[in-house]
Amino acid sequence: SDGTVDITKSYEGIEGSIVTIDGGTISVVSSDDGINCAGGSDTGSTDRMGADQFSSQDGVELNINRGTVTIDAEGDGLDSNGNFTMTGGTVCVCGPTNGGNGALDYNGTATVTGGTLIACGAVGMEEGFGDNSTQYSVLHDLGSTVSANEKLTITDSDGKEILSFTPTKTWQSVVFTSADLKEGETYTITAGSQSETVTIDGIVTSNSKGKNFGGGHGGRRGF
């Protein structure tokens, strides 16, 4: 559960039908998905095409329980053709820059009960955690694209920094979750010259019109 994995160049960094992270430090740079959980043979990006591209696969899981995970992906950051469950750990995702992929991508459910995650990507296919979670999360699309290497900060109403990350790619959509988020509280998202506020009004707060159009398993419209 400890140790270091440093993948500096890959097509898909980590791939399997069930991927469980219980500790350690993992860093992935990929030309497609950072972590990909799928059943069947490896058919590359074509396994997402066809009539059943959004159907959930039985026995396919991505589980993050502990550890530190950093993803720099041209495709989906964290991709599960089944379920995604996060109970702990720290996760930072950078990418994708094209609207055909998402920082998070799942076909089943995405549940967060603990840990910290901040994931930045393009607008178009973005997804957040589902309302079956027990920890608050936000999926927020900014008004315009943020340049690469601009620091992103999430601060509370007192100006205390809750989360921060400096993506190395352009982005417009962010997913974040932390045990510090509280219902009814207002938080400020600052990135480059942009600054927007969001008020937590439920287990999932979202203004996204992405893959699930702000509803379904990606979470409801929050404001």
Where are these regions (language model features)?
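A composition-driven surface/loop motif
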Residues: 1-223
